[in-house]
Regions:
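Short S/T/G/P-rich N-terminal loop/turn motif that feeds into the first structured element of a domain
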Residues: 1-224, 229-270
Length: 270
């Protein structure tokens, strides 16, 4: 059952669905010095070079490990490039195939698609520069392939609904659940694997995991009359979280992502 049948979408929010065809090119990168980071920043700021299909880029710098169950190296930066419909033909050679500039070591590159009803941002999203207490949570998740359908159902019917409420209440900046569609490159030392990435801007002080946040958000109004902790317990049996980090936002040139929802323009509330 679609989430639309029991929850109307607040007019201050955009929820990007798979049929909106938002495509994300993600790169996990290790940089050697500040000059190399400056090169990444310059590329993210000048994202328009990738043409009309590109909706922007964002760049995050690693700050701390929240949870780790992998021996793979911890990369210094994550870069997300957003496209409508398909990745621009210029992007993959520059970002993946060609030799990278000095000091930039590519560890993994992949194509991501949105998880059903679980990619939520405000209509007026302009980044989190005005919320210095927030950090960017990046959760790397491995779902057993045979359970992907069940995972999407739980994300759509419970996690996505809770995320909408938390973004609407400004508890979270955005909540962006994405699924790996294709791995374009993986360095030999990258032994860790995942097939989902969840991004969320939040205040880490007092944060004790999404399960508790989502359960509290759904405590009053339960989807399908199911106890939220039961639904979230299902996730624990079908997925692992090899790594979960907190990061600083270096570049957030991604406000145009909301424009991929062409069929439902945002309404501004005063």
């Amino acid at each position: 059952m679609s989430e639309e049948t029991h929850r109307s979408l607040d007019s201050r929010l955009v929820r990007v669905e798979p049929d909106d065809r938002l495509v994300v090119l993600a790169r996990m990168i290790e940089v050697s010095d500040s000059e190399a980071e400056a090169t990444l920043v310059d590329g993210a700021v000048n994202w328009s070079r990738f043409g009309d299909k590109c909706l922007g880029q964002s760049l995050y710098r690693h700050r701390a490990v929240f949870q780790n169950a992998a021996d793979a190296p911890v990369w210094s930066h994550v870069e997300l490039s957003y496209f409508h419909d398909m990745v621009s033909p210029e992007a993959i050679p520059e970002l993946v195939l060609n030799q990278q500039p000095r000091g930039i070591h590519l560890l993994r590159a992949e194509i991501l698609l949105t998880t059903p009803s679980s990619f939520v941002l405000p209509c007026d999203w302009q980044g989190s520069v005005d919320r210095p207490e927030r950090q960017v949570s990046l959760e790397y998740i491995e779902v057993q392939p045979k359970h992907l359908r069940r995972y999407r159902e739980v994300m759509r019917d419970y996690c996505g609904v809770a995320a909408m409420k938390l973004v609407q209440e400004d508890r979270f900046g955005t909540f962006r659940a994405m699924e790996t569609a294709a791995i374009l490159y993986r360095a030999p030392e990258m032994t860790m694997d995942w097939n989902q990435i969840h991004l969320c801007e939040l205040d880490p002080n007092g944060f004790d995991g999404f399960g508790k946040e989502f359960a509290a958000a759904l405590r009053v109004d339960r989807p399908n009359d199911v106890d939220p902790p039961d639904a979230f317990a299902d996730l624990g049996s079908i997925r692992t979280v090899p790594r979960w980090t907190f990061n600083d936002a270096v570049v957030e040139a991604d406000s145009a992502v909301r424009s991929c929802k062409h069929d439902r323009p945002c309404k501004r509330h005063r």
